[in-house]
């Protein structure tokens, strides 16, 4: 992990290359993170890859910060394999318009991960080549990982288990 000084240096260099992109830095329990403007995430990740050696996108995942606003977050975990360094890039979007640019054109490993964030949290990724649900049925309403999602009620009947699975009733 970059230490505190290294993180601030990276943030400064990113700020020079992409003004206004880095909103805050966070160093907690030896984990370095950059909080970035959602409009700049694709450029920030590209800069981290080309200029700072973070060539592997390990994870894209969603977060719900309910009851705080902006409520929804997307986190990216990058790895520099030559130095075994990790850095997190975090952004937040409101529930009114949860949109962010897709990084799939630059990082193909993000494809299914962005679809999962879309499916579970409802964050749309502009420019994604195939943004549709990946875990839930296409006609499913809601996003199950949001904190205000109602738990309980009727089980979801998937097409492969509607009449054949024991224990499911109609």
Residue ranges: model-predicted function:
Residues 1-170:
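Terminal low-complexity/charged segments
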């Amino acid at each position: 992990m970059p230490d505190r000084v290294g993180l601030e240096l990276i943030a400064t260099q990113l700020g020079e290359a992409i003004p206004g992109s880095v909103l805050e830095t966070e160093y907690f329990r030896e984990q370095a993170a950059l909080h970035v403007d959602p409009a700049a995430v694709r450029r920030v990740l590209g800069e981290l890859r080309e200029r700072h050696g973070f060539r592997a996108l390990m994870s894209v995942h969603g977060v719900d910060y309910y009851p705080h606003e902006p409520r929804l977050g997307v986190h990216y975990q990058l790895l520099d394999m030559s130095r075994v360094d990790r850095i997190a890039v975090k952004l937040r979007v409101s529930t009114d318009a949860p949109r962010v640019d897709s990084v799939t054109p630059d990082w193909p490993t993000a494809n299914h991960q962005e679809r999962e964030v879309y499916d579970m949290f409802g964050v749309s990724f502009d420019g994604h080549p195939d943004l549709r649900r990946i875990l839930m049925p296409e006609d499913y309403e809601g996003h199950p990982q949001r904190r205000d999602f109602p738990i309980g009620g009727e089980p979801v009947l998937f097409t492969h288990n509607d009449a054949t699975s024991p224990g499911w009733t109609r």
